[in-house]
């Protein structure tokens, strides 16, 4: 989604810089449109070999401090082959000294401060943009960018490869499995761009991108079409993003199918610190993730359509509160709801038979979890690890772990402090008894009693400790009238993972005492 927008932004920036580069925006009040066109024409003559630009109209309104270009066409015929056109460009309140400030920055980039910004314009509006590049093309009905500014410290940073160099490096490895070293030039180039721009707000309407992806041994050739009705946001600055929203996205990949997204949003994304390290040429290591944060990313109303036209409601997914420290994830939340699995969409007879045995045509699935790791306290908490199938039941897990330190071998160093597992039955138990009875030609009620009797028989070999007896009673109660079953582990003191691994040799009663086992039903 970002690439076509960056192409247009880059085009507008060079137009703005070129138009005022010879005589300066400050003199437009004296010369108005004619001087603007003269400066623009002279700048066009300085384009590198393989690039050309034309325009049909170019005007400057002194009263509104607005430059307007019509019928803009820009072509690349060298290493980067592309063809871009824009029906109309409006630049309001262009920076009076952008060209001079940029020239000064380029003359001594080592002296630049990372947060030194060069304002480009108060507002830039683009209408009717089209670009063709290779096997891809993009169109945009309109786009508006307010408060665009550039940070030459990043854009002119020493050692950053050019886009041509990045393309050459990737092309050379196209027939091989790419390694991390192969994509480092691309990562560094993109870090320069993302750290080199900022803007106050943006809004785009009716964007469409099409591309043909060549066939691979694993996949056929694919025609991809990506459309968005509108998207916009506010507050992006050097790798720190505020709010952004999208409405009406469709991704069609023939012949594989289509995905539609009713709405998407993101907020409070921070990746300035990792980008700065990449820009400096630091090798990627886990600690580079420190400082990366995701406030929230959410996709609402997702739907997939199969090649034969069948629709699959995918639902809503969100990730939030993602944070890292010392190279490990220390917090995060995941939520997913609304996936509908239909018997009619199952690809094989065995799957459809499973639906029939349960007496269902559709399963509605949701899941989620919340995670935190306090590295100073060496404590990890996991909450609401939930899997819910509306038609069958819901499983929910919470856990507290102690002595958790990052690094290899953590599974031998940690300790279990508390675990709570709860199952709330909607109909699964009764459906399972009915399905089993149907296969064995038995009565469901009689089969239920047989299973309860088997629990009693098995319990006899587990000893007569109070914890075991209470667990058996709870399990029998649940089987007789399935509503809920809760399993809690609350040891008197945290139990090391190594001790848990060795506990298999202990008598059942001793194991129950070690882990503080409690099982209750229908509470």
Feature names for model-found ranges:
Residues 18-523:
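Glycine-rich, small/hydroxylated-residue low-complexity segments
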